[in-house]
Design a protein with these regions (language model features):
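Glycine-rich phosphate/ribose-binding loops and adjacent secondary-structure elements
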Residues: 10, 15-136
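Short linear motifs in intrinsically disordered/low-complexity regions
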Residues: 6-9, 13, 119, 189, ...
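Context-gated lysine
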Residues: 1-2, 16, 38, 76-77, ...
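C-terminal extensions of enzymes
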Residues: 137-219
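Residue-level signal for well-ordered alpha-helical scaffold segments within enzymatic catalytic domains
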Residues: 2, 43, 68-71, 155, ...
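Acidic/glycine-rich phosphate/pyrophosphate-binding loops and surrounding catalytic core
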Residues: 2-7, 35
């Protein structure tokens, strides 16, 4: 109700150079979500967002609500998933019709020494990286990987040097942007599903035995 009141109150007051999105709400209740999606779709807005799925819900609940809700939003308008998420969340969101996302994960995790790679997330505070002279990820062209080793970045983090956090954030943002480029290329090529499965498998998001039996397990 609050969202509908907000949208109705904005008629003729919106800057024409900006886009107005309706936000689908309803927690994890599919019937409420679907009803609200239909109501905001009637307003013919610039785009539509799915909100309220990054405040404690499980990944399984998020994917269920997307499965139930997104089909009731206009297919020809951009769809935005708010406050999400991990690389796996983004891949699963795109597979369910989401076009774009916003999230603090890359920067927040980077500030704590957690960095993303194509083989999964690593914590540079772990002692095993103390003498690791490899870059965060082999072949990565981000500023951190081109010039610094895991060992040196870990030293910066342990010494509470701001550069350590900045390098981790730079790497994570580069990783996310590169993944989004790969997603767009896979969609254009018509092989997104196979790309997603391979990406999740390489990042350790799919259990090998479950995959072999046709069942997926997300962590």
């Amino acid at each position: 109700k609050k969202e509908m009141n907000r949208l109705n109150s904005l008629e003729d007051t919106v800057n024409k150079n900006q886009m107005l999105f309706g936000i689908d709400q309803g927690a994890i209740y599919a019937d409420i979500r679907i009803d609200h999606a239909k109501r905001i779709s009637e307003l013919d807005l610039d785009g539509y967002a799915v909100g309220g799925l990054a405040v404690g819900e499980t990944h399984e609940e998020m994917y269920y609500i997307l499965d139930e809700t997104v089909p009731h939003l206009p297919r020809k308008k951009p769809t935005y998933l708010m406050g999400v998420g991990t690389p796996a969340n983004i891949l699963e969101g795109v597979d369910r019709g989401i076009d774009f996302f916003d999230c603090v994960y890359p920067s927040r995790n980077g500030r704590h020494g957690h960095v993303y790679t194509n083989q999964g997330k690593i914590n540079l505070f772990n002692q095993k990286y103390e003498k690791d002279m490899r870059p965060i990820e082999e072949g990565c062209q981000c500023p951190a990987c081109r010039r610094y080793s895991r060992a040196y970045i870990r030293h910066l983090l342990k010494a509470k040097e701001m550069l350590g956090m900045r390098l981790c954030v730079l790497h994570n943002l580069y990783f996310y942007n590169t993944m989004m480029e790969e997603i767009r290329d896979a969609l254009d090529a018509g092989n997104f599903r196979s790309y997603k499965e391979e990406k999740l498998y390489n990042m350790g998001q799919i259990d090998r035995e479950k995959e072999m039996s046709g069942q997926k397990k997300f962590h």
